[in-house]
Amino acid sequence: MSMNGDGYLDTDEALRLLDLGIRNGALLDMAMSIDNRGTPIEGESPRTYADGKARMELLGYDVHAGLRIAPGASTASLSLSHLHVVRQSDAATASIASLLRNQTVGLTITVSIYRSGGTDTAQAEPMIEFVFTGGRVNEVAYLTGGSSGHPCEIVRFGYRVMSINSAPQLATGIRGAVRTCDLTAS
């Protein structure tokens, strides 16, 4: 996916990101939570999660990590992209816009991916979880289009640290041993 590099999403870029969420349908088993210093941003997800925290359903996400080597340098530095999430607009839309307007910093954004196929059991734990700390909302795009036609939004988050937790997930929804990696941009 190429971005034009000006730091802002134009409509064509937003429509390409919207494709992240609509290729496999709107009922993927992904969720996001946004914690604003202990206060969760609540959407309309009726699902109950193992940790009891409120989450918002996600249609898709995009984040990159890579090494960049400056000319003449002997070691590479770690580069982290912004986090883009694609979601259907809901009750949390105005709350997320308020985080942008107020330039709120210090958010914790958690993206959870479940393999168990959308089970409604509260014991389901994610097979992959991305936790972004030191976050802020940098941009929001509101649009319809693509094959979904539903009101959607793309939220671009900046952050300081990305933690990745992955584990095998059993058919019951419980996960096995967790592997962890923390990435901090240098």
Residue ranges with predicted function:
Residues 1-186:
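Glycine-rich, low-complexity intrinsically disordered segments
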